């Protein structure tokens, strides 16, 4: 690259950054919205699928479990691929994969066909969270990073709401297959991203540094990215801490999201219609909370707000369980929803700023998705307590997980260790 070319490239980066990252944000927001819709479709279509294929409860549950396994694999591979091939390319590839295979689910003729295709599609769906957040963290200025990434995460929550509305309209009128046929529509977002958004400058510079090292007289041996992470004492320590924190966060979140509606309905005796209204209200306040948390985290720091959201959730959940009445449960749920929505708004920024560009995708994807294994056991844990007592007892275990999740980074992980807009 000549000096003149370098100057022109630098000018392009400084003149158009806002236009580029705004375009990237809109497309990534819609991609995560589609991701949230697709993931939620399984829950809403499960009863219809179970009836059509004459499935047992165990077989029906296996669809969700294998989807989760696929998501973990996708997150691990996707994080590595982001560092190896580029953030934009990975999002494009996995979006096409997920949309194509999810659409194919509308044509399956057996349970095993559905299980296999859904598991592979989940690999694509699982990678998009890491890839989109990594891309945006490297485009958005530090001053606004948490606010923008928090707004990005509202797309996923909004996707769950959209899935509720779409399933309620489509399944009674057209059947569950139509639900999956329409998942081909978001594939257009992949092509728009490919043509409108270039790879982040920090990733391009990081790759160029590696090429220069390879071209030098010193022979550079390619290493497994996980080996690179574990070899460095500081990277290894932060990586292991985030695995523990992410595991506790997803353990608590999975347990609450799966069992909270059942708790309201069975333990508190709330009607299904009223329970649905409470959950919609909770989702809406979560969206608001994510935006507020992002703004406050940019102003006061990621560490403090993440601890407040996670530990606040942990401390407020017993209040919901032990001090609810028919007249105050709505207000308690809204206050709980605000705290419950905060951690995921800050988590992505906090994690991406904990690692350098050269290993960011691998480290964040690895920590988050190894931690996701904890989510597999959360519904079973609450089910165990519910079998011998009440769902509320199991929810208290989730509160403990949230407290641990916030305590670990509060004690050991500093704010803004690395700037995602720099090569390293």
Which stretches of residues belong to each language-model region?
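Cytosolic juxtamembrane N-terminal segment immediately preceding the first transmembrane helix
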Residues: 1-37
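Extracytoplasmic gate region of multi-pass secondary transporters
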Residues: 42-43, 233-290
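Interfacial helix-cap and linker-helix signal at transmembrane-aqueous boundaries
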Residues: 49-50, 81-82, 166-174, 264-265, ...
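Helix-breaking motifs and short loop linkers at transmembrane-helix boundaries and internal kinks
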Residues: 54, 86, 107-113, 141, ...
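Conserved MFS/SLC helix-loop-helix module at the cytosolic interface between two early adjacent transmembrane helices
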Residues: 73-109
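Cytoplasmic membrane-interface "Motif A"-like loop-to-helix N-cap segments
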Residues: 84-94, 299-310
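Cytoplasmic helix-loop-helix junction between adjacent transmembrane helices
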Residues: 117-154
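Helix-loop-helix hairpin linking two adjacent transmembrane segments in secondary transporters
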Residues: 152, 156-195
